[in-house]
Amino acid sequence: MGMIKVIKMDLHGYHPSEIVQTDVLKKIIQQTWEMGENCVTLIHGHGRNRGISPGFVNTNTGYFGLEIRRALRHDKELRQWISYTTLDCSDMGVTRVKLKPNPAPTRSELDHDLLPEMKLGRRSW
């Protein structure tokens, strides 16, 4: 059996509008698959330091995590790379999904400019 290869992507400090509502999440998944990885772990935070908000009471994440999970479950374009039924939401602030096998990986690393530039200070979204 081959080694299980997992990419971990820390998305702390980003807003869903920068990752989920753009093509960044798609690029993360696609490039990870192109590397021949087996799984991608998206670290988005659990949103607990903001108190209990309506809609988050029975979840182990906040708004960002829910948006990521919604995209992974429902974006049909992502299904060419992921096994969406393998979505793992068991850890607080983290979402994992298994990738479909790639018999011929074409890249060795993620693009260095994959994530948008971090903005300092208050954002205007």
Predicted regions and their residues:
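Long, charged, low-complexity intrinsically disordered regions
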Residues: M1-W125
